[in-house]
Amino acid sequence: MTIQSPTIEAPTAVQPKLRFTPEEYFAHEERAEYKSEYHNGEILPMTGGSINHNRIARNGLTLLTVQLQDSSCEPFGSDMRIWIADHQLCTYPDLAVICGEPLFYANRNDTITNPVLIVEVLSPSTEDYDRGRKFQAYRTLPSLQDYLLIQQEAPLVEHF
């Protein structure tokens, strides 16, 4: 019987994060079965919302649609992306409103650059991001006039 000593492998280097161009991100989104956000070269999968989250977003879209029907403004739900050039960030807010003609990123009719209102329904897993890094990026949009954060666990709406 021969006893062999264990093989010890040299440690491997930490794999660098994959970096993608915006064009690669959009190509990924077109064939993906889930939504992702683009963060300065990284593609980050999004989590789904709770039933309350979806109810609040749906009710908000319905309310905005009725209130804005005779205006030059148009509300959009969470399938409309927003591109924030200064941060190389592409997000899917819960609701957005455009007034006047939409301005599209790279002639893509699914990605706007000129929202006047952005609404996020807060979730425990995303609240810090919605209040922090994402809000910081949204503030660089020249068109943005209002940002609303809606709590789903309590009747609270914050307006910035």
Regions found by a protein language model. Name each.
Residues 1-160:
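Gly/Pro/Ser/Thr-rich low-complexity, intrinsically disordered segments predominantly at protein N-termini
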